Design a protein with these regions (language model features):
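Mid-chain, structured segments of secreted extracytoplasmic proteins
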Residues: 66-111
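Short acidic/polar N-terminal linker immediately downstream of export determinants
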Residues: 5-54, 69-77, 107-122, 185-203
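Exposed beta-strand and adjacent loop surfaces of beta-rich binding modules
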Residues: 42, 61-63, 84, 130, ...
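Flexible glycine-/small-residue-rich
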Residues: 47, 66-68, 100-102, 125-127, ...
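Short, surface-exposed interaction patches in beta-rich subdomains
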Residues: 28-38, 65, 143-144, 152-153, ...
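Repetitive beta-strand solenoid architecture
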Residues: 39, 48, 58, 92, ...
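Surface-exposed edge beta-strands and adjoining flexible/disordered loops or tails in beta-rich
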Residues: 60-62, 149-152
Length: 222
């Protein structure tokens, strides 16, 4: 009898753990940031969870809309969770760093609560500036950038629209598990380790994309 009771309690505990997040709703809080940024400068992004939209424009300025997204049972319960996410913007002009900080991890439960916290970014940056981006879990969209790009994503999809194929010097896109698609030469590959590469000695722009699990899509911006 005691064994059966223990089994029922364990089953209920597991069921509660699985269903708990499903009962929560999403709440969000939006903040905006801006800083001067010059052509051919470098924007470095370090993000853990959340989607990232980046668009190039003809302005010497970096504008960021950061949406903190949390899962909670009510709006009141969501308010203290926003404080667990910190958006840090450092530097200006030639070098800018954007980071998302999470609460310190504990050794006995290193990922506790992280699934409830994310930051989505919408970014406008000089079209001829350079980008270095690292994201653990999230989708990335990049459009209208002519500078160098280095994109590393663990879990998610990356979509890049290339403004000018003539200016593209090199493209390397690789997924450890997933798919890679490009309309530059009609390439479409999937499975384990798909990759595509492109080289034009007269071009100027270099793009390097690496995804652990997900997809890479490279298109002409028409």
């Amino acid at each position: 009898m005691a064994w059966k009771t223990k089994w029922v309690l364990v089953s209920l505990w597991l069921l509660w753990g699985l269903c708990g997040p499903a009962r929560a709703d999403e709440f969000s809080q939006v903040s905006r940031y801006a800083v001067r940024m010059f052509s051919y400068g470098l924007l470095t992004i370090d993000s853990r969870m959340g989607d990232i939209h980046i668009e190039g424009w003809d302005e010497p300025r970096l504008e960021i809309e950061a949406e903190k997204v949390v899962r909670a049972k009510s709006e009141e319960a969501a308010k203290p969770l926003y404080k667990n996410l910190t958006v840090i913007l450092e530097g200006k002009d030639k070098r800018v760093v954007l980071r998302t900080l999470y609460p310190p991890r504990r050794m006995w439960r290193p990922f506790r609560g992280e699934a409830r916290l994310a930051v989505n970014y919408r970014i406008k940056m000089p079209f001829d500036a350079n980008l270095a981006l690292r994201c653990v879990d999230g989708d990335v969209w990049i459009r209208g950038l002519e500078g160098k790009q280095r994109i590393l994503v663990n879990y998610g999809d990356v979509e890049i629209d290339i403004p000018s194929v003539d200016r593209l010097r090199s493209l390397y896109a690789h997924a450890w598990l997933g798919y890679v698609q490009s309309d530059l030469h009609g390439e479409d590959r999937g499975g384990f380790g798909p990759r595509i590469s492109f080289w034009n000695p007269t071009g100027e722009q270099d793009i390097y994309v690496k995804v652990r699990m997900g997809g890479v899509f490279v298109y002409r911006d028409e």
